[in-house]
Amino acid sequence: MKVRLFEIFTSVEGEGILYGTKTLFVRLAGCPFTCFYCDTKESLPLNSGTEYTIDEANKLIDSNLHDQTYKVNFTGGDPLIQHQAVAQLAKHIQNKKIPTYLESSCFDIDRFNHVLPFIDIVKIEFKTKDSDFVDSEHYAKLIGHTMKCLESSVISKKTTYIKIVVSSKTQPNEFKKLVDDIFNIISKENIDGFIIQPTYGISEPSLDLLLNLYDIVFPYYIDVKVVPQLHKFIGAP
């Protein structure tokens, strides 16, 4: 089996509940979406990056591990594009007793369930309609898969948190519908974090909008946080 890796690097976690922790990032090539706010557009094509065998990729990852590595983060693109390879790479890392972390929009429940046994921490990104990448019919299908993946992660008792990227284009009524739907299938006790992530440098949301969106989530989940991307402020990759 082969895998296409765009890059491997050590940095600090710039997003979410593990914000600021030292992390080895394994960025895989390929993504099915073209969100307007994407900050890694060069990794979207599946033919980007470099092709390796699984053994070669495992050796490359091993050569970048340090005693202080807190976790290994599989990111993209979207790692589920190469789900079979991710499962093998993550299993290799788990055997070293290092936590594995998946960042994904969870666009396919079958691919997700194939990877899930080898993942410890799951960041599920729910896309909003204003992401400008699909029509309404395809958006509904995507959200259906993402919801199923959320349920699967919770049932499997993985550390699970939700991220929603918001911009000045985000409509509070659409955001509220998405949040209502999320908490119709899970309870607040089922997740480990809920992050509202504002875009940076493009269509940035106002503070008033961010507070409005925060107030929508708060009745469901009082530990909701608005968290910008740390790495963009400290010059990290």
Predicted regions and their residues:
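Conserved AdoMet/S-adenosylmethionine-binding subsite of the radical SAM
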Residues: 81-224, 229-231, 235-237
